[in-house]
């Protein structure tokens, strides 16, 4: 089976890693996987997908985002070219901006088996009419990464497993996988000795990163030896560096 995975960007982020895990599982199952990236990408992440066994198609040679009507035409031409070349049996769309547009285009271009995965809760959308239209009329399955997120979209939630029938209900929760060998530290830690708090994330408001430094400043007032290490990049980088100075958290 040929499976098309559609994603807006291939940078260094949680969604990309989850998608990489999906690619590895599909390839291990004997499927041909084609990953199509619409806009931004890093060469390193493209290579990781290729090493996992996926063919990778980057629609934008320069890795730049195209918006508005030009963006819709850009996606239409790019997806049409990919469908003509690879003739996928199933398309899996990561439901991120530009959101519903790739799904609507895939349906218009004749793809009937579409799976959509949302990686956030519904509170980022002003209303859910379009999401519900997509779920009811355009996709075979709409999955979320937590039950809380699924309930925020649809009012109910259900964990999916291999025995779950696909009938009238077509929205489920499938948790992101942890890497093999991942171990959780179970020892109780106290603040008797210094603790280092680590945060790995895109530096964006949607990730709550505008709150990290102010929150840490409150912790540091009570436990002065506590340290914070943030690994990531994004539009909030300069603001967060300024917060560090304003909150006197440089030491």
Stretches found by the model and what they are:
Residues 5-13, 17-73, 162-167, 235-237:
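N-terminal strand-loop element at the rim of the active site
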Residues 93-99, 118:
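Short His-centered aromatic/hydrophobic patch
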